[in-house]
Every structure is written in structure tokens, then in C-alpha cells.
């Protein structure tokens, strides 16, 4: 009879659209084919209404979770004389908007359209009675849900205790009240109150598990594998590898010798390079002898002029700005260089430098006074210079009145001291001092009397002369003199240039 199922705790599956309901059977109507549940739960959440009625046509599956004992269903009152199938399985359940419907048996494949379900309210959880028959089977869904809910709440209380303890003691905690706050609480429980089957009460023992790891055995296995595969061993204590990598070389190097150049006479002045190597100065007579011996061995004047012109032009290009100034974007701002040359070999060196500068798109203005007879070296250099875009002038009036980017001085020569008394020499010195452009002197002589053009930079050839402060900052260029040529004139020589052809020198 239908009254036999009153008070039973059942689980009704209404499909994916309506979900699963649990509750205690309060009424079974065979005429209208409906079943009512009191204190219902929808998908594990307490429902708003105290009672929900289902139609048989919307029931997909019906499970009996608990059958009440005798006398447990007397408080439900008189019920309709109806009958319910043995299990109710194979039927579907639907809910009307008013919570009522008809009980109609249908196959599991048929279902009705889902209906709206009333909203949930904040209803206090109630205890569910469990009969002695439940001891032989698993706990009901309601009991398991209540236990998991209490566990999840206690879990959150433990793990969120820092939030309450970190507040200021005098700071009041805001409280929420009302139905809306209760709904938010139920939503939090629905989101974060999942079933937690097991919460570990003890922390993980890291030290104990680390003690179980045999590191020595693992490292021995790795070393054995590397020896067999031929890879480099990691190294064992008290064992020294037979070979070292390039970055593991611990062999002590020889002490650094900074004085690698020794001259045969007393040194009046010494210089040093950026790396600390000592470069002594030599006298003009020894320098002249060095060039003469080099020329005898094949380093002719033409080669020396070419090498000097290349080194001087490289230094001048660097002083003009290098790639920042000489690039296709600055074609409209070509640097201007004024060359002041005398009628001697020093002047020929300047003309060679001007030719290389003109080949690098530098605007070169060459000043050379007119003489009836010129040296062959000067004639050859002028012939090459005339094939460039450089400009040659013989009068100081043709020199630019505005400042140029650089002035290269090649007027002085120790063998032609009388030229300093010439009007063109004095006029050229006056023009250079008034132009206010930086001056680079190529192979300047040692002046006994301070006069002429004060240079900002000076370029020495091979080995420097004992130049004074008027020479500015000293640079040294390599003109290709072999080491044995130095030894032939009594100089113990080791190149200080390294990877460069022009290096700066500093006063020691």
C-alpha cells in the first residue's frame, strides 16, 4: 500500500535539467501520480519550501535510502489509498512551478521540459533520523552531506584562522545579517563546501623522507654512468683529474714583465701604455739611425710614407667622430680638415695622410708653399693627392676663415730650422692659433725653444721622442719596423702595440 512508504528517505533523480532531490516521503497520490517529499534537499542543498511534489513522468530514477520502522509514519496523517511500485526505478520526475504534478509511469528515455525551482533560503540544518536497518548499509546521502559540510566548515576555520588573528585587537569585525546574507552564505557553502573525504591532521615529514634518500648511492650511479659513456667525471674527493678545461686551468703564469723595451742610452723620459708596458723615449739621432737602417733593409721611404699616412688618417678619422660622424646620414655635414705642410719629408707624410682622408669623404684643404724645386717624395705625393677631391692652396688667404674640424700640422722639421723665419711659416702658425680648431701634429720634433703651434695630440713613429707639454697627448704608431732592425741599432725591442696600430702613451 502507499502508506507503507511514508516516512521513507528517498533519492529522486530528475535528470540533468532538474537535478537530484532527497527527502522524506510525506505523501503518495496514486490518482494524480505524484509523490511529495518533506524537508527536501536539491543537489545537496536545503530547499526553500518545506515540501516538494514530483510527477511520475519527470522521475528518471528513484532510490530508497532508508525505510522507517513500525510507528514512525503515524505523524503524517491520513493519506490517499494509493500504491507505489516496488522500487519506482525506470521513471522520471518533473516539478511544476507550484510544486505539484501528476504521477505517471514512463520509460526512462522520456522526459518533460524543466521547470523553475524555488530559490533556497537560509534554513538551519536538521538532524536526520537513522533506523537500525541503516547499520547494514551505507550512510544516507543526507547524513554524508551533513558530515562533509561540517568537515569543510571546520577545515576553513582552521586554515583561515590567520585572518582573524591578524586583525587589530580593537578593530571590530563587520557582521552581516538578513536573508540576503544568508543566501550568500549558502552560495559560499555550495562553492567551497565540497565533500572532503580525508583531511590529514599531521604535517608531512620532510626530514624523515629525506633520510630515506640515499644520496651517495645515487651519485655513485651517476658517476658510473658517466665513466661508461665517456663524459667528464664530476670529480671524487681526493681525486685530481688528469686534464683541465680551458676555464679550469689553475697553472700559475709567469710574472708579467712591463719593461720590454731597453734602449742603449740614458732615458730622459718614459711613457707607458694602457696595459702598463713601459715605452722609453729615444733621441732624435737614434731615431734617425733606426729609420736609416730600416730603409737599408727594404723599408723604403715610400713604404714609410704610406704607412704613416694610413696610421695618421685612422687617428684623424677617430678624432673627427668615427662612425657617428662619417655615415650616409651626415653627407651634408662632411668634416673639414686643414693640412699645413712644409717642403720636406714631414710635409710628405702629411700629404699622404690628406690623400687617405680625402678617400674617406673628408673635405681636405692642403696648404703647401710654392718652391722652385720640390723633393721627389713631395712631388709623388702631390701627384696622387691631385687625383682626389682635396683642395691644394699655396696662399694663406685661401684657407677658410671659419673654424675647421681639425688642423694637421706638418710644418716643422729638425733639419730645416731656418724655415721658421719665413713669412709663410709665421703666417701659417698665426692662422692655426686663431682658428681655434684642435691640432694634430704628425712626427713633431723636439723644440728647444717653445714656439710654433701648440698641439692637442701628437703622433710619434716607431718610438717616441722626449716631447714636451706643447705636444699635447702623445700617440704612437707602428710603421712596420722589424724587431731585428731595432736590435741592430742596439734596442732590445718587444712590440707594445698588441692588436692595434695606434696606441696612446701616458707619462710615466
Curated annotation (Swiss-Prot):
InterPro entries documented for this protein: DFDF, FDF_dom, Lsm14-like_N, Lsm16_N, Sm, YjeF_N_dom, YjeF_N_dom_sf
Residues of the signal peptide: none
Mutagenesis / variant outcome for changing residue 306 to A: Abolishes homodimerization and RNA binding
Disordered, as annotated region: 95-192
Annotated region described as Required for P-body targeting and interaction with DCP1A, given as residue ranges: 1-79
GO terms under cellular component: cytoplasmic ribonucleoprotein granule; cytosol; membrane; P-body
Function recorded in the entry: Binds single-stranded RNA. Involved in the process of mRNA degradation and in the positive regulation of mRNA decapping. May play a role in spermiogenesis and oogenesis.
Implicated disorder: Intellectual developmental disorder, autosomal recessive 50: A disorder characterized by significantly below average general intellectual functioning associated with impairments in adaptive behavior and manifested during the developmental period. MRT50 patients show mild intellectual disability and microcephaly.
Protein name: Enhancer of mRNA-decapping protein 3
Name of the gene this protein is made from: EDC3
Amino acid at each position: 500500500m502507499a502508506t507503507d512508504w511514508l516516512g521513507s528517505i528517498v533519492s529522486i533523480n530528475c535528470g540533468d535539467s532538474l537535478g537530484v532531490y532527497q527527502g522524506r516521503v510525506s505523501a503518495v497520490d496514486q490518482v494524480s501520480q505524484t509523490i511529495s517529499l518533506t524537508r527536501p534537499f536539491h543537489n545537496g542543498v536545503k530547499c526553500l519550501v518545506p515540501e516538494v511534489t514530483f510527477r511520475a513522468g519527470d522521475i528518471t530514477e528513484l532510490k530508497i535510502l532508508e525505510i522507517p520502522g513500525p510507528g514512525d509514519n503515524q505523524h503524517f496523517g491520513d493519506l490517499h489509498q494509493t500504491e507505489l511500485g516496488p522500487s519506482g526505478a525506470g521513471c522520471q520526475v518533473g516539478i511544476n512551478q507550484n510544486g505539484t504534478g501528476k504521477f505517471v509511469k514512463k520509460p526512462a528515455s522520456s522526459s518533460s521540459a524543466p521547470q523553475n525551482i524555488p530559490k533556497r533560503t537560509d534554513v538551519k540544518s536538521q538532524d536526520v533520523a537513522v533506523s537500525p536497518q541503516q547499520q547494514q548499509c551505507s550512510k544516507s546521502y543526507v547524513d554524508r552531506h551533513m558530515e562533509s559540510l561540517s568537515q569543510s566548515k571546520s577545515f576553513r576555520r582552521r586554515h583561515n584562522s590567520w585572518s582573524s588573528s591578524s586583525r587589530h585587537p580593537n578593530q571590530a569585525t563587520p557582521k552581516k545579517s538578513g536573508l540576503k546574507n544568508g543566501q550568500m552564505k549558502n552560495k559560499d557553502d555550495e562553492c567551497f563546501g565540497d565533500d572532503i573525504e580525508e583531511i590529514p591532521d599531521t604535517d608531512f615529514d620532510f626530514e624523515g623522507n629525506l633520510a630515506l634518500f640515499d644520496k651517495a648511492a645515487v651519485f655513485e650511479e651517476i658517476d658510473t654512468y658517466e665513466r661508461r659513456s665517456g663524459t667528464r667525471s664530476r670529480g671524487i674527493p681526493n681525486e685530481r683529474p688528469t686534464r683541465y678545461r680551458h676555464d679550469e686551468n689553475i697553472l700559475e703564469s709567469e710574472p708579467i714583465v712591463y719593461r720590454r723595451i731597453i734602449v742603449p742610452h740614458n732615458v730622459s723620459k718614459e711613457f707607458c701604455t694602457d696595459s702598463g708596458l713601459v715605452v722609453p723615449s729615444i733621441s732624435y739621432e737614434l731615431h734617425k739611425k733606426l729609420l736609416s737602417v730600416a730603409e737599408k733593409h727594404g723599408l723604403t721611404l715610400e713604404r714609410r710614407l704610406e704607412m704613416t699616412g694610413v696610421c695618421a688618417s685612422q687617428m684623424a678619422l677617430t678624432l673627427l667622430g668615427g662612425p657617428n660622424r662619417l655615415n650616409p646620414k651626415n653627407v651634408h655635414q662632411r668634416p673639414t680638415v686643414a693640412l699645413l705642410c712644409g717642403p720636406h719629408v714631414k710635409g710628405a707624410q702629411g700629404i699622404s695622410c690628406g690623400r687617405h682622408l680625402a678617400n674617406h669623404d673628408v673635405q681636405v684643404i692642403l696648404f703647401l708653399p710654392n718652391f722652385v724645386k720640390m723633393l721627389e717624395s713631395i712631388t709623388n705625393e702631390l701627384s696622387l693627392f691631385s687625383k682626389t677631391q682635396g683642395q691644394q692652396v699655396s696662399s694663406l688667404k685661401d684657407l677658410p676663415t671659419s673654424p675647421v674640424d681639425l688642423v694637421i700640422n706638418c710644418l716643422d722639421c729638425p733639419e730645416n730650422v731656418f724655415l721658421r723665419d719665413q713669412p709663410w711659416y709665421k703666417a701659417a702658425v698665426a692662422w692655426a692659433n686663431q682658428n681655434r680648431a684642435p691640432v694634430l701634429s704628425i712626427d713633431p720634433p723636439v723644440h728647444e725653444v717653445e714656439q710654433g703651434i701648440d698641439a692637442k695630440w701628437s703622433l710619434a713613429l716607431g718610438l717616441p721622442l722626449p716631447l714636451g707639454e706643447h705636444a699635447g697627448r702623445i700617440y704612437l704608431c707602428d710603421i712596420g719596423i722589424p724587431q731585428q732592425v731595432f736590435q741592430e741599432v742596439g734596442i732590445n725591442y718587444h712590440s707594445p702595440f698588441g692588436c692595434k696600430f695606434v696606441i696612446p702613451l701616458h707619462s710615466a
